Amino acid sequence: MAVEKTNSSSSLAEVIDRILDKGIVVDAWVRVSLVGIELLAIEARIVIASVETYLKYAEAVGLTQSAAMPA
């Protein structure tokens, strides 16, 4: 996937539209420790996309077929 560069500025609506259209994944890992003692550890993976974008990629990797079958 190539990074597209533009010289024009984008409005907030255009940025949100692009994020929902393409999707974005934020992978975070935080560790808080004091004197070598780990107090807090947080791991998170946040996916932001429109339902249409999610379903398109979920279908491509076969996630929608297993969800459609009754247990």
Swiss-Prot record:
Principal subcellular localisation of the protein: other
UniProt-listed PROSITE patterns: GAS_VESICLE_A_1, GAS_VESICLE_A_2
InterPro entries xref list: Gas-vesicle_GvpA-like, Gas_vesicle_GvpA, GvpA, GvpA-like_CS
Induction, as annotated: Constitutively transcribed when grown in a 12 hour light/dark regime at 2000 umol photon/m(2)/s; decreased light, growth at 38 degrees Celsius or both increased transcripts up to 23-fold.
Source taxon at top rank: Bacteria
GO terms assigned for molecular function: structural molecule activity
Signal peptide region: none
Entry keyword set: Gas vesicle
Subunit: The gas vesicle shell is 2 nm thick and consists of a single layer of this protein. It forms helical ribs nearly perpendicular to the long axis of the vesicle.
Designated name of the protein: Gas vesicle protein A
Gene field: gvpA
